Each structure stands twice: as structure tokens, then as C-alpha cells.
UniProtKB/Swiss-Prot annotation:
Homodimer. This is Ribosomal RNA large subunit methyltransferase H. GO terms for cellular component: cytoplasm. NCBIfam families: PRK00103.1-4 (NF000986). It catalyses: pseudouridine(1915) in 23S rRNA + S-adenosyl-L-methionine = N(3)-methylpseudouridine(1915) in 23S rRNA + S-adenosyl-L-homocysteine + H(+). It comes from Albidiferax ferrireducens (strain ATCC BAA-621 / DSM 15236 / T118) (Rhodoferax ferrireducens). GO terms for molecular function: rRNA (pseudouridine-N3-)-methyltransferase activity. It holds the Pfam family SPOUT_MTase. Specifically methylates the pseudouridine at position 1915 (m3Psi1915) in 23S rRNA. The gene is rlmH.
């Protein structure tokens, strides 16, 4: 099974890339994690609707065929770490690839969010996109560690 993080925005600070790389290498062979960064639509004189629609096309092109789509959305379902661990366990049992999608500066296209299988919220706080990537991969690793009885997570 693969966890594919599809994120709008190709540039992240070095610290975020270092953190991403550190967590990505910790995952076991049977649970691969990969990042697909797609280009942010240039602003110009376009409306927000036009921007997120263009980004939607890039996101959809990056999605693995037949995957479960989970949109990160500020109005999505809030999760605890244990709830995320339970979701991860269910996803692994289904054995389909899961794409977790992080929108750009203007968020995700409303139609894309509506079509997603799930919408989740990582935090009530507004976070920089680079931080979201790191937070997401860390929480996915933590969820895996809970399910595997690995000592990384402590209650």
C-alpha cells in the first residue's frame, strides 16, 4: 500500500525537506510514502476560482489510479492521533493506495473536496504549507507506530 501526499507548491524550506526525508525513511517496506508536489497556479489577474480549478487539474493528474482520496480541509472532520491510527489501519486492510491532498494558498477546488472520499482537518490553526507536509507525515508515522506497537508514540 502507498500513502501518496499530493501537495500544491513545489518549493519548501530546507528544514521542511529535511524533516520530510527523515520521517519518510522510517516507514516500513509494506507502507510506502511518497510526495507528489504539483505547481501552484500563477496568480496574475485570475480569480481564486480559476486558480484552484487549474490546480485541481494538476492534482488529479498526480493521483494514483483507483486511489482513496482524502482532502485536507479546514472544515473537514477533526481527528485525534488514535482516530488517525484507526483510519490508517482500515486503509491498510483495504490495501488500496491512499492520496492525501494538501491544497495551495487558496485551498482546494470546492468540487474536488466534494468528490473526495474523505475530508479531514489536521488542526484548527492556520499553518504554513511546508509545516502541514511535515505535520502530516509525522502524524502518519505516529499512526503507523501505534498500530505496530512501536515505542515511538507514548500516551
Amino acid at each position: 500500500m502507498r500513502l501518496v501526499i499530493v501537495a500544491v507548491g513545489q518549493r519548501v524550506p530546507d528544514w521542511a525537506q529535511t524533516a520530510w526525508d527523515d520521517y519518510a525513511k522510517r516507514f516500513p517496506f509494506e507502507l510506502k510514502v511518497e510526495l507528489k508536489a504539483v505547481k501552484t497556479e500563477p496568480r496574475g489577474s485570475k480569480t481564486v476560482e480559476a486558480l484552484v480549478a487549474a490546480e485541481r487539474g494538476r492534482i488529479e493528474a498526480a493521483l494514483p489510479k483507483g486511489c482513496r482520496i482524502v482532502a485536507l480541509d479546514e472544515r473537514g472532520t477533526p481527528l485525534t492521533t488514535l482516530a488517525l491510527a484507526a483510519k490508517l489501519q482500515n486503509w491498510q486492510l483495504e490495501s488500496d493506495d491512499v492520496a492525501l491532498v494538501i491544497g495551495g494558498p487558496d485551498g482546494l477546488d470546492p468540487a474536488f473536496k466534494q468528490a473526495a472520499h474523505e475530508r479531514i482537518r489536521l488542526s484548527d490553526l492556520t499553518l504554513p504549507h511546508a509545516m502541514v507536509r511535515v505535520l502530516l507525515i509525522e502524524q502518519l508515522y505516529r499512526a503507523w507506530s501505534i498500530n505496530a506497537n512501536h515505542p515511538y508514540h507514548r500516551e
